[in-house]
């Protein structure tokens, strides 16, 4: 293939205008196709004819026709643009097969996923990964996510769910709130303030399953789990949390576990839409399960 002399190459806008004129059969139709004005298309085609010093179109009343030279050039452009589009589509497909978008509860992302994520990137540096922290049950397709991680019992409509890890719930508190105690009776827990996140209604049922009366407890409310957990670390109140998310807090003594719930149905699940799985998503799912 001979080297391209870019200085002799006609402007791309003029080539597009003529190719559209040839395929659509006129300036007006080409203008609609390219979302520009009739005058802009006509001007570009005239400029191309001047650049090539060859007539490409001719008029017969209201009808526009291609000259023999115009027909040959239009075919060459159609073939060339078709090859460019095919190559671009292949690149986009390759990129979309590798790209991965994951929706995940914010605290799970910060406390469980982020400490492990460097290992994934080290092993798979070619997979672009985007995290969408969101505590809501979002529609994966609507937000453009390949997979999601959800907390619950593993039953949600419209998705395939795969168990990732158990989520035993524990009651924790900062050491200063407990005054040196390691365990509290139900009566003692009922007398202390509680830190609560507003977007987790099931926590009231869990507290009730412990033998507490939620309506009689004093709550300090926070809009999300991140702030509620931060408040618990500061000693503002007792807090119900997934043990897997506070392993470091317990190990370092920032929080003390004072009660374990026996509820075993809760867990974190990987969810995805039905149908073919993105290859990058399969790699990430396999890695998640190995980490868990």
From Swiss-Prot:
Ranges annotated as DNA-binding: 27-46
Record-annotated disulphide pairs: none
Gene3D superfamilies reported in the protein's UniProt record: Periplasmic binding protein-like II, Winged helix-like DNA-binding domain superfamily/Winged helix DNA-binding domain
Annotated InterPro entries: LysR_subst-bd, Tscrpt_reg_HTH_LysR, WH-like_DNA-bd_sf, WH_DNA-bd_sf
GO biological process, alphabetically ordered: DNA-templated transcription
Keyword terms: Activator, DNA-binding, Transcription, Transcription regulation
Domain HTH lysR-type intervals: 10-67
Annotated GO MF terms: DNA-binding transcription factor activity; sequence-specific DNA binding
Pfam families: HTH_1, LysR_substrate
Role description: Functions as a low-light activator of ahcY expression (gene for S-adenosyl-L-homocysteine hydrolase) and as a high-light activator of an uncharacterized 21.6 kDa protein in the ahcY-hvrB intergenic region (orf5). It is also a negative regulator of its own expression.
Family note: Belongs to the LysR transcriptional regulatory family.
Protein's name according to its UniProt entry: AhcY transcriptional activator HvrB
Organism, as annotated: Rhodobacter capsulatus (strain ATCC BAA-309 / NBRC 16581 / SB1003)
This protein's encoding gene: hvrB
